Amino acid sequence: MSKTGQQIEDDIYVFVKNSQLASLINGGVYKFGTRQRDSNNEDAIVKFVTGYNTQNPLQSGTVVINIYVPDIDQLDNGVLVRDITRCTEIEIAANDWVESLTANKSNYLFEMAQTIYTEEEPEINQHFVSIRLKFKLTTF
């Protein structure tokens, strides 16, 4: 039986929540739309993006995990900038986590949809590490 987008997001949320990646960040893991607006923590947001019922019992699609990192006042001059060191640490850990995802741990097969990178979120003085994954799901 095919899964819905929310069911897939729920599955990925559990994978992230129970990962070493979650223990690396100082915030929480949230499903899309549930992170507190004023959070200044390193929070991971899991979002289902697209899904296709390609061939029964196979589904495929894309999910994204964004890990927010608060900007820092690096020069003590009141100007907030990207915490390059921390973003790099999280990018490397995220890459290691993605490489550890194997089909023998679940019915999902993952591959990176694009290189893991950091993007600016200027309205909240934070940046986020973006992990975009393609998935294939076997539903028996």
Segments from the language model and where they lie:
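Short secondary-structure boundary/capping segments within folded domains
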Residues: R35-N40, N53-P57
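N-terminal, polar/charged subdomain of small-to-medium soluble alpha/beta proteins
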Residues: G28-R35, N41-D43, R86
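Charged, amphipathic alpha-helical segments and their flanking helix caps
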Residues: M1-N26, F48-F140
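Intrinsically disordered, low-complexity, compositionally biased regions/tails
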Residues: E9, K31-F32, R37, I65
